[in-house]
Amino acid sequence: QVMTRPAEEKSVLLSDGTEVILNSESELTYDRNYNKNNRSVHLIGEAYFSVKKGDIPFNVLTPHGKVSVLGTSFNIRARNDGFEVGVNDGEVQVSNENSLISLSKGQLIDVKSEFLSSNIIQIPTNQYPDWLNRKFYCDETTLESLCLEIERTFDIKINFTNPNLKSLTITGLIEASDLDNVLQ
């Protein structure tokens, strides 16, 4: 089991050569027999996976669904509010109790309900995932959602004196190399 605290990232190299980079406030667990009969890991939070090709499928299990691949690079965000999968290279299959959908390079799906939507978004793979590049990419993102990411990234607490501000939306790219930069 590997866990990260707020404002912490960790890189994990699995026994099959797969690299996992855990974002802040995330947890990765896997069996001690990983790579013998299965290549399955459990994720709560967010992580970027660069999966080494192999004969045994690589599976990421989250509270919201499962992602299966043979070898590729992709990001998963599995937090309380839903499940997001974006593919940088290769192809993945995303499934939950009700649906199965395939994604390929440059595609992202954001699942907020029990059904996988066929609403697939095209993403710029050179900017995704934004947290690995020390940026916040916002596309009609609520101020509340952005502030949650800022809190996780910098281990701070942001309070809204006016609750109406939470629903304001932001579109743009914010450099997140340091907190002063973000707050400007």
Which role fits each region the language model picked out?
Residues 1-184:
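A residue-level detector for the "anchor" residue at the start of short, highly conserved motifs
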